[in-house]
């Protein structure tokens, strides 16, 4: 008999969203997941599955039953010939990497945070950068999913293909993802090179940068022309690191947090802070090399609010210059650094922000120094307006103000996804307030 807990308070990593589920379950087997869903049907309860809790939105929140998949975290099979690995959906990427290392395998692309579950990564459309690479879910070759009625579907391109096309970005609303099979590549090392540039230079030579580096991204420092360009590419170099406690923590975290807190009383400081920290930390070339997963992952030190929309790649320059012009025209609107700009190959996953188009993701951020919220509404709304103007689609895990009407315009396959969702979960067991805004 599956055991549930009362009185559990759930908070996401950034402590920006939370909820009090009526019951909190940590199943250890498929049978126990089935028991939870049977109880939910009997008592007419909503169910949400939660992974690492990193989503900066209320996508995982519920006052019904919450299922934490952390105890279903095994590697089930490694197929060395096909270079594929099958895992339980609750495994954290941080725990998967050393297992893949043992077999000389790696994932070809990863997001910045690995303290997340495989089921959650695909559910929210997690991405990184590189025009040869899709969002992380494009590495999924098969999955199993338990429907609201307790039956299990095996999904791949050759079995339940429609559900597979939807479930690779499932939003937690199709069922409980039980297992995922990932396509891997041989283990590889990456060399990361970062160097200073200007916004004009990077936008004028965007195609050249995209061709030069397999995993290219750049950071723009609002209220300035400053840019840090980051290349990541395959290497045979020995592992080396450019990290340094004094610069990374004493300056890059403790001093920055204090100055950002000060700027909540003196907002005009923000532009100066952005320029000062570019000069301190990003004004020279740096190199580091290591196993791919150690280079892809970096430590998020700050609690934060973020938005991250995907626009057609060819609109990058126009959209970024419009964001810059908006900030120049409204000096009272302040923006923390960086605006992170990444690039992703198009795909055929129904609710992927990169559905049928190569995309540019433009991530904006406002930190919460010492847990204090900084006024961001004007910046947020102006950014959303610009993103919508250029055909943007918001990252599913991150907060946004879009509703069904918006998604119907953004996603050619939106109605197809809705039909699949209604077939798999006719009573709406897996919905919550976030998803009701999406679908109703």
UniProtKB/Swiss-Prot annotation:
Keywords: Ascorbate biosynthesis, Endoplasmic reticulum, FAD, Flavoprotein, Membrane, Microsome, Oxidoreductase, Transmembrane, Transmembrane helix. It catalyses: L-gulono-1,4-lactone + O2 = L-ascorbate + H2O2 + H(+). Pfam families: ALO, FAD_binding_4. One of its GO terms (biological process) is L-ascorbic acid biosynthetic process. Pathway: Cofactor biosynthesis; L-ascorbate biosynthesis via UDP-alpha-D-glucuronate pathway; L-ascorbate from UDP-alpha-D-glucuronate: step 4/4. The chain crosses the membrane at residues 251-273. PROSITE patterns: FAD_PCMH, OX2_COVAL_FAD. It is found in: Microsome membrane; Endoplasmic reticulum membrane. One of its GO terms (molecular function) is L-gulonolactone oxidase activity. Its cofactor is FAD. It is a single-pass membrane protein. Its EC number is 1.1.3.8. The keyword Transmembrane applies. Oxidizes L-gulono-1,4-lactone to hydrogen peroxide and L-xylo-hexulonolactone which spontaneously isomerizes to L-ascorbate. Belongs to the oxygen-dependent FAD-linked oxidoreductase family. This is L-gulonolactone oxidase. It comes from Mus musculus (Mouse). The gene is Gulo.
């Amino acid at each position: 008999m599956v055991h549930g807990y009362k009185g559990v308070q759930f908070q996401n990593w950034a402590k920006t969203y939370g909820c009090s589920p009526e019951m909190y379950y940590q199943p250890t087997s498929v049978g126990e997941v089935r028991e939870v869903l049977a109880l939910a049907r009997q008592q007419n309860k909503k169910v949400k599955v939660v992974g690492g809790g990193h989503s900066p939105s209320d996508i995982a929140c519920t006052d019904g039953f919450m299922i934490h998949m952390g105890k279903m975290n095994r590697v089930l099979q490694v197929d060395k010939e096909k270079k594929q690995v099958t895992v339980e959906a609750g495994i954290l990427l941080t725990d998967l990497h050393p297992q893949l290392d043992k077999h000389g395998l790696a994932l070809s692309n990863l997001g910045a945070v690995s303290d997340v579950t495989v089921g959650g990564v695909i559910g929210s459309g997690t991405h990184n950068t590189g025009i040869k690479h899709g969002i992380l879910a494009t590495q999924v070759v098969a999955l199993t999913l338990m429907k609201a009625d307790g039956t299990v579907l095996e999904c791949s391109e050759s079995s339940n293909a429609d559900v597979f096309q939807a479930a690779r970005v499932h939003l937690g609303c199709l069922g409980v993802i039980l297992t995922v099979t990932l396509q891997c590549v041989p283990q590889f090392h990456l060399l990361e090179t970062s160097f200073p540039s200007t916004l004009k230079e990077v936008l004028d030579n965007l195609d050249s940068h995209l061709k030069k580096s397999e995993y290219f991204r750049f950071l723009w420092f609002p209220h300035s022309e400053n840019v840090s360009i980051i290349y990541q590419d395959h290497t045979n170099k020995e592992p080396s690191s450019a990290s340094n406690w004094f610069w990374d923590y004493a300056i890059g975290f403790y001093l920055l947090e204090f100055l950002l807190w000060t700027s909540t009383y003196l907002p005009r400081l923000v532009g100066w802070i952005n320029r000062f920290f570019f000069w301190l930390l990003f004004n020279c070339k740096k190199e580091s090399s290591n196993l791919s997963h150690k280079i892809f992952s970096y430590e998020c030190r700050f609690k934060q609010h973020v938005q991250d929309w995907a626009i057609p790649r060819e609109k990058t320059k126009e959209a970024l210059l419009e964001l810059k012009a908006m900030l120049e025209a409204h000096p009272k609107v302040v923006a923390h650094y960086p605006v992170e700009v990444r690039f992703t190959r198009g795909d055929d996953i129904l609710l992927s922000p990169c559905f049928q188009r190569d995309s540019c993701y433009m991530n904006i951020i406002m930190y919460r120094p010492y847990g204090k919220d900084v006024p961001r509404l004007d910046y947020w709304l102006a950014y959303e307006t610009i993103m919508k103007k250029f055909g943007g689609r918001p990252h599913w895990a991150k907060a946004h103000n879009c509703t069904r009407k918006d998604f119907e315009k953004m996603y050619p396959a939106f109605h197809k996804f809705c039909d699949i969702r209604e077939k798999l979960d006719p009573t709406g067991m897996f919905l919550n307030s976030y998803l009701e805004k999406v679908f109703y």
